[in-house]
């Protein structure tokens, strides 16, 4: 990433001795195309992970879709802890390519990548919606808003999905304070 990256640091620890992870095949392709991103460590099963800034998320997602990553398997969020960052992730698969490959070789390796956007919890975290690229992002982005308070610019239905409309706060944030009592209105 460039020196002007908007990805907030994970903590205040000295990271000068940390070696950057090797770029995987998708990260290398993004570098060749001139996209700014950050290669992250692969996850526990070896899936390539890439950090991107919120501003370039739709551009990189569109580039990956045009490069065969045509299926959003999962989108979600998580909280790294009180005072730490919020994270949105997007797990993309090359599904059409995989189906064709499996027709001739059932053991064909699936191409997949996980994009991560790191957000500061200060103020209102906002990301551009990728609903226009992947329709499956609809309820997944709404759930992430509902549980973590991350807003998605350009989403056609920006409202709570699971919690009542008048709910205060974001229940899956680690700094969330549970209300003593919440009275549900009669359903009829």
Swiss-Prot record:
Its main location: membrane. Its EC number is 7.1.1.-. The keyword NADP applies. It is a peripheral membrane protein. It is an enzyme of class 7 (translocase). GO terms for cellular component: plasma membrane-derived thylakoid membrane. InterPro entries: NADH_DH_suC (IPR010218), NADH_quin_OxRdtase_su_C/D-like (IPR037232), NADH_UbQ_OxRdtase_30kDa_su (IPR001268), NADH_UbQ_OxRdtase_CS (IPR020396). It catalyses: a plastoquinone + NADH + (n+1) H(+)(in) = a plastoquinol + NAD(+) + n H(+)(out); a plastoquinone + NADPH + (n+1) H(+)(in) = a plastoquinol + NADP(+) + n H(+)(out). Keywords: Membrane, NAD, NADP, Plastoquinone, Quinone, Thylakoid, Translocase, Transport. It comes from the Bacteria. GO terms for biological process: photosynthesis, light reaction. It is found in: Cellular thylakoid membrane. GO terms for molecular function: NADH dehydrogenase (ubiquinone) activity; quinone binding. Belongs to the complex I 30 kDa subunit family. NDH-1 shuttles electrons from an unknown electron donor, via FMN and iron-sulfur (Fe-S) centers, to quinones in the respiratory and/or the photosynthetic chain. The immediate electron acceptor for the enzyme in this species is believed to be plastoquinone. Couples the redox reaction to proton translocation, and thus conserves the redox energy in a proton gradient. Cyanobacterial NDH-1 also plays a role in inorganic carbon-concentration. NDH-1 can be composed of about 15 different subunits; different subcomplexes with different compositions have been identified which probably have different functions. This is NAD(P)H-quinone oxidoreductase subunit J. The gene is ndhJ.
